[in-house]
A protein has these predicted regions:
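Hydrophobic membrane-insertion alpha-helices, especially the h-region
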Residues: 7-19
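Cleft-lining beta-strand/loop regions that shape enzyme active-site pockets
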Residues: 23-26, 48-56, 215-221, 236-258, ...
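N-terminal mature-domain "stem" immediately C-terminal to a signal peptide or N-terminal signal-anchor/transmembrane
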Residues: 26-73
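Extracytoplasmic/secreted proteins, especially bacterial periplasmic and envelope-associated proteins
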Residues: 37, 41, 59, 63, ...
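Acidic/histidine-rich, surface-exposed loop or edge segments in extracytoplasmic proteins
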Residues: 39-51, 89-93, 206-210, 375-378
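PDZ/PDZ-like domain segments forming the peptide/carboxylate-binding groove
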Residues: 54, 70-71, 92, 111-122, ...
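Extended, small/polar residue-biased N-terminal targeting/export presequences
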Residues: 56-62, 69-142, 205, 212-267, ...
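Well-structured core secondary-structure elements of compact alpha/beta domains
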Residues: 146-156, 160-206, 271, 298, ...
């Protein structure tokens, strides 16, 4: 068993990310036993290591209950009132179940929800098989906070029919407006209302097929992760549980890189399709794949029998395709223009350029300004010496100084945070030395994070741009530089 705790700036305070890797050989393969052990581990970590431990009582239990129900069916699309009545028997017992590693409540909700989802999947297609009558006046309540759960399946069907009718109507209005405009321009023939209504229904059917396909690939553990997060977020909004798969995505997002072929995938009509070729990646460099190509099978060597992936969960198919830099993967591809062929790809480190700092020059009649946009405070947690926000900001500042700028603008708009260490380092580029931020840990211990380097990289005019989506690390950097009268 391997356990890691991550302290990470994401939204104004230091957040606790709990990540567990549990070896399949360390205990019984029974899923229920695994869930119980995981609940026990999470509870222990929160109790011993969280900055602000909570009292696990009936009030806590009620909040977890409300949070979990809202997380799984906030729009009242699946569950019935009778289900909620059954669930409510546990509303003030979840605290006891947490303390005893009991998952009876979760099991009940999980089984009931999946049953209801199957029922909806079986009847929504009937609703969309026939045209809607838009001449009939109907009302629908879209305020999900005040909307009640359906009394029974018939009422749920009515609710779905109205929502689908509204969705088709929205699509109809949009498609009709587009068609009329294209007709005026002479690029398209004018379509009948019946044709446009059919197109709108077909679009909704395709969207719902994708939704239920995605849902069918969710495993019990995915739902249990939602339950765990309903518990841990009661400690504070910035405490999260990350399953191994989510942790991998988290690392990719915060580092801005991953090892693989350099393509994004989606699942459509039971097939794995290339949705984007990432600039700079192996596929892009050698022009090996195109958007719309379908991956039929994957092999790790020329001699290996390819594994069909059409019926796989998308994340499982992705795991087969990704791999360490320098290794090869062999994909059986159905080309978007037709034809099937095998493509050999050498995996490499793929950098997501949209993650990284970028600079540009702004000029007016009298001055030249440097603008640096920083989307997030990225870092490789396994190796700070690798590319990170601070090292890239330093390079951009040096580059802009060579262009003899008169002032510098650091754009942190929409930057939701990231690595605290990079914040301290970046602050140091603009001040001689001194404290940047104070971190208070469990037990009341206070740590002052300082810039100890007396050198200043940029001592000229400095402007920091922030907006309502600038959070956490962005707020710390902006506040520190303001306190030092540097911005």
């Amino acid at each position: 068993m391997f356990l890691r705790i991550f302290g990470f700036i994401v939204s104004g305070v230091i957040s606790l990310f709990i990540y567990f890797e549990v070896s399949n050989t360390s205990f019984s393969s029974n899923e229920s036993n695994k869930d119980k052990l995981l609940l026990d581990l999470v509870s222990y970590v929160l109790d011993k290591l969280h900055y602000d431990p909570q009292i696990i009582n009936d009030d806590f239990s009620a909040k977890v209950y409300d949070n979990f129900i809202d997380a799984i069916d906030s729009q009242k699309r699946f569950l019935l009132k009778s289900d909620l009545k059954l669930f409510s028997e546990y509303k003030y017992l979840i605290d006891d179940q947490i303390n005893s590693s009991d998952i009876t409540f979760f099991n009940l909700v999980y089984e009931t929800l999946n049953k209801r989802i199957d029922e909806v999947e079986n009847f929504y297609q009937e609703v969309l098989e026939v045209p809607f009558n838009f001449n009939t006046n109907e009302e629908i309540n879209l305020d999900y906070d005040v909307l009640s759960f359906a009394e029974n399946i018939n009422e749920l069907k009515t609710l779905w029919r109205k929502r689908l009718k509204l969705s088709v109507l929205d699509g109809f209005a949009s498609k009709k407006e587009t068609n009329e405009k294209e007709n005026e321009e002479g690029t398209k023939e004018l379509k009948s209302d019946q044709e446009i209504e059919l197109e709108s229904r077909e679009s909704i059917i395709e969207n719902l097929e994708d939704f239920f396909q995605f849902n069918s690939e969710l495993e019990r553990f995915d739902w249990f992760s939602i339950y765990l997060n309903s518990i841990v977020t009661q400690f504070d909004p910035h405490t999260s549980y990350l399953a191994p798969e989510a942790k991998e995505v988290f690392d990719q997002n915060i580092s801005g890189k991953f090892q693989g072929i350099g393509a994004r995938l989606l699942k459509r009509n039971q097939q794995v399709e290339i949705s984007e070729v990432i600039i700079g990646g192996p596929v892009w460099r050698d022009n090996l794949l195109n958007v719309g190509d379908i991956i039929l099978a994957v092999a790790q060597s020329k001699d290996e029998e390819p594994t069909e992936i059409s019926l796989m969960k998308l994340s499982d198919a992705t795991d087969l395709i990704k791999g360490e830099k320098g290794t090869n993967v062999y994909l059986t591809i159905k080309r978007v223009e037709g034809g099937i062929e095998e493509v050999e790809i050498t995996r490499d480190i793929v950098e997501l350029e949209e993650t990284y700092a970028k600079s540009s020059i702004i000029k007016d009649d009298f001055n030249t300004f440097g603008l640096i946009n920083l989307p997030r405070f990225y870092v490789d947690f396994d190796d700070y010496g690798e590319r990170n926000a601070a090292s890239d900001i330093k390079k951009e500042i040096l580059s802009l100084k060579e262009k003899e700028i008169n002032g510098l603008i650091l754009d942190l708009r929409n930057n939701g945070g990231g690595s605290l260490k990079t914040v301290v380092d970046i602050t140091g580029f603009f001040i001689e030395k001194g404290p940047v931020v104070q971190v208070k840990s469990i037990g009341g211990r206070k740590d002052i994070l300082k810039d100890n380097d007396p050198s200043i990289l940029w001592d000229g005019p400095l402007v920091i741009l922030v907006n309502e989506f600038s959070a956490s690390a962005s707020e710390i950097l902006a506040a520190a530089l303001q306190d030092y009268n540097r911005a």
